[in-house]
Amino acid sequence: MVFTKDTKIREIIQHPSFRGFGHLLFPLQLAFHPEETVQDVTDSNHFIWYSNLKTKTSLEVLNNLLERAQKNEQIFFPIYDEDEMVKDPSKRETGLFYFKGKEYEKFALINAGGGFHYVAALHDSFPQALALSQRGYNAFALIYRPKKAYEDLAQALDYLFSHSSELKIVPDQYSLWGGSAGARMAIRLGNKSELQRLTRTSIEPASMVVSQYTSYSSVSRDDAPTYANCGTNDWIANWQVMENRLKNLKKLGIDSQFHVYKGLGHGFGIGKDTVAEGWIDNAISFWEKQINK
């Protein structure tokens, strides 16, 4: 079976290859109707606050996951153990979707936005993760609880560092990525002090952070090098606030790079078929620059 634009959400969620986690492919908090199709839900009425949603992009992601799962590759990893999930059943609503790159290569952890109301992974983290894996990097897209987002991101980092050998990933010089609310998560956990406060193990700070369309403005000497982008027509995140933040990072001696795209609105994701298309290659180059320092 190959998923198409006419495949129903129910068919994807209940697919045997996605048993136990298929429901996490779509936003739990928005409760899409199971009889709607992939094409039906790929719009801003379903993924609220987002723009530039592409059915083709969603299908590329879903079919990649399906193909790998059918080859008996583990594509989903819970971040909490069974005892923790029994004590707090909401922790079952979390986990990492794995987009595999080269063995023993560095990893990226990507957080979709959704206003801390839902997790827009299918548009705002899965496509970026797939693109990173195609470049050879191991990429993990986090499904988190919107009201406990920072706790879940910290737990995800703990999990990846604790299981790096089994996952065949290199934990050093990892990167944190995020869009909108997910960008706030990446920025905060990319900060050395916040990382030490929130994680339970000794974890090195991220080598860099990717921050898409967020008006987060605070800076600290503990912040990570940052690549950021936004559109001029973003009515949620002001691009000038973002630009000023990165200028302030530079004043602190922290490497940063900012890109603004004329006419783009909030939540353009990977930017397919827009003036932002290809931004992810620039972000990867920025990451590689930090790695090679």
Say what each PLM segment does.
Residues 1-16, 20-27, 229, 252-293:
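C-terminal catalytic histidine-bearing segment of alpha/beta-hydrolase fold enzymes
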Residues 88-100, 106-107:
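A short loop-to-beta-strand scaffold at the N-terminal edge of the catalytic core in hydrolase folds
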Residues 151, 155-223:
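Primarily recognizes the serine-hydrolase "nucleophile elbow" in alpha/beta-hydrolase
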Residues 1-93:
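N-terminal targeting or regulatory segments adjacent to alpha/beta-hydrolase or S9 domains
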